[in-house]
């Protein structure tokens, strides 16, 4: 079984109001992207989708990681599409692809392994990590039908009923 991992690190992080790319901000003295790299370092192939200040972000990527440049930052789906259509990914034969944001310093290898193992065990087409929170404002919601996953709806697209859902998308697939 072959697994690839990709870190999404192309965004500007405009809400941080900083000229430094979001993934390069330190948590406990370590850039956030380093935590993400450590979390997927055991996978067979490792990629980082870079965009905003791509040279600066690429200069921090671990030696075994492959940068893929996203020229326009058009969201998560576009970043993943950029990877899948890239020459860097062309010869990748992995059966599974794990996607994580570059700004989640608390994610660990064992959590990603559990996600992959659950996908395999359940013969699922896709898996994701979600969380139940008291205040889901600003997050994509996990919409279910009879306890079965139906879709992810972003805050800006959610109706009033969907905005009451407290199960959110972590951005980890």
Task: Identify the meaning behind each predicted range.
Residues 63, 107-173:
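Conserved core of the sugar-phosphate nucleotidyltransferase
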Residues 11, 103, 132:
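Active-site glycine-centered loops adjacent to acidic/histidine catalytic or metal-binding residues
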Residues 1-18:
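N-terminal nucleotide-binding beta1-loop-alpha1 segment
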Residues 24, 67, 126-128:
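Conserved beta-strand scaffold positions in the cores of enzyme catalytic domains, especially
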Residues 5-7, 48-49, 98-99, 126-129:
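Structural beta-sheet core signal
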Residues 30-102, 106-117:
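Conserved N-terminal catalytic core of the sugar/cofactor nucleotidyltransferase
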Residues 20-26:
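Short glycine-enriched, charge-decorated loop/helix-capping segments at active-site entrances
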Residues 17-19, 42, 100, 164-168:
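Short glycine-enriched loop/turn motifs at secondary-structure junctions
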